[in-house]
UniProtKB/Swiss-Prot annotation:
Family: Belongs to the CinA family.
SMART domains linked to this entry: MoCF_biosynth
Gene3D superfamilies xrefs: CinA-like, MoaB/Mog-like domain
Pfam families assigned to the protein according to its UniProt record, in alphabetical order: CinA, MoCF_biosynth
Lineage of origin: Bacteria, Bacillati, Actinomycetota, Actinomycetes, Mycobacteriales
Organism, as annotated: Mycobacterium marinum (strain ATCC BAA-535 / M)
Domain of life of the native organism: Bacteria
The protein's name: CinA-like protein
CDD domains: cinA
Signal peptide: none
């Protein structure tokens, strides 16, 4: 593939480095760069020490990158040192931008005016305390703040884009930031790519790997495709990036996948199973009955906007007594087959269907561990039932791998796919 403009991301913040706060900026910026056709070479995370930040910038510069993007360290406190470090790295003097200082002051004044105890007479001290945020490297291009922290682009080779740490500020600022002349000049060599996503469920990763090895030896110009695969909770996501001229090569690979794994492919347009289920549930009424997943399936179904139009309700029946009292499961059925069994899953689904006046119900009962397993029903044994009012009934028992959290999450994914298949028939 042709060499594109290359970028690196430096995420700053001791709270991110130590894991107290999850990095949401690096992956998000990476997606934006991918859409622009900019090759991401590195993402690094460092603490707030100036020497560590500068070391990351120099490492990035040594990789011959066109653009370095930093996030974090733009506040008014003593440990917010990113701008000062970037100025030193770029060999630029720090100067006070009077217009920017006024902009920040006006934002602060509006924010403080919401406080009934705000005394305008004390504002000068607040303005002085935040003056640091108006200090910028000479020649830097200013990106208007969303909060109080402005962003910056310092032109050069590499250009440096400086963005705030909070995602709620960084993300709205991105479009303006990447349109800055310094940023546009840095990524002028970007390549136009197409990107396609195929999602599969029920296919071992080794099965996909074998098919791709076959494609590599039988499809001309296979090397023109940049293919990445990711296995998540039993689903496989295959993302392919290519230049427009390789469209026919990708089409051949997609055909090969359909021929070999058509039953496992559930999306070729990037849609997730949650999106597909939401569409299939339009004009329906669904209820859930959950034991080991304790409401995770109901939470997932209601995560999509508009779900109130089709989700009637759910029952978490963790105990046998709750299964009997809330869902009408016959205690004798539990005594005969055990709480983790297909007959009980069917009875739970039927109870949810009746209790909520729904036309579709999903039930999950299982052993998430680490205790509770037996030789006959080891940890990871989960029973599912999808019941549709017209008589369709899909029941499965699976042994799911992983720890307690893995088993619970995988169970919700399996339930979503069983629901998708039942409603697609």
């Amino acid at each position: 593939m042709a060499v594109s403009a290359r970028a690196g991301i430096v995420v700053t913040g001791t709270e991110v480095l130590t894991g107290r706060v999850q990095d949401r900026n690096g992956p998000w910026i990476a997606d934006q760069l991918l859409e622009l056709g900019v090759e991401l070479a590195h993402i690094t995370i460092c603490g707030d020490r100036p020497a560590d930040i500068e070391a990351q910038l120099r490492f990035m510069a040594d990789q011959d990158l066109d653009l370095i993007i930093t996030s974090g360290g733009l506040g008014p406190t003593a440990d917010d040192m990113t701008v000062e470090v970037v100025a030193r790295f770029c060999g630029r003097e720090l100067i006070l931008d009077a217009e920017l200082e006024d902009t920040i002051a006006n934002i602060l004044k509006r924010l403080m005016a919401r406080n009934p105890g705000f005394d305008p007479g004390n504002f000068d001290s607040v303005r002085a305390a935040n003056q640091k945020q108006a200090m910028i490297p000479a020649g830097a291009q200013v990106i208007n703040p969303v909060g109080t922290a402005p962003g910056l682009v310092v032109p050069g080779k590499p250009a440096v884009m400086v963005l705030p740490g909070p995602p709620r500020e960084l993300q709205p600022m991105w479009h303006s930031a990447i349109q800055m002349p310094g940023a546009q000049e840095a990524i002028a060599g970007r390549t136009t790519y197409r990107q396609e996503t195929i999602r599969m469920f029920g296919l071992p990763e080794s099965g996909l790997a074998e098919t791709l090895r076959s494609a590599e030896t039988t499809i001309p110009d296979f090397g023109a495709l940049e293919i990445t695969t990711c296995l998540r909770r039993g689903e496989i996501e295959m993302v392919t990036r290519y230049e427009p001229g390789a469209a026919d090569t990708y089409a051949q690979v997609a055909r090969l996948l359909r021929d070999r794994h058509g039953d496992q492919i559930y999306s070729e347009d990037g849609s997730q199973v949650d999106d597909l289920v939401a569409r299939l549930l339009a004009d329906r009424r669904i209820a859930t009955a959950e034991s080991c997943t304790a409401g995770l399936l109901a939470a997932r179904l209601t995560d999509r906007p508009g779900s109130s139009g089709y989700v009637m309700g759910g029952v978490v029946s963790y105990s046998n007594e709750a299964k009997a009292e809330l869902l009408g499961v016959d205690p004798a059925l539990i005594e005969m087959h055990g709480a983790v069994s297909e007959p009980v899953a069917q009875a739970m689904a039927a109870g949810a269907l009746q209790r909520f006046g729904a036309d579709t119900a999903v039930a999950i009962t299982g052993i998430a561990g680490p205790g509770g397993g037996t030789e006959q029903k080891p940890v990871g044994t989960v029973c599912f039932c999808v019941l549709v009012g017209d008589g369709r009934n899909v029941t499965r028992t699976l042994r799911l791998p992983g720890n307690r959290s893995d088993i619970r999450e995988r169970s919700t994914t399996v339930a979503m796919h069983l629901l998708r298949r039942a409603l697609s028939e």
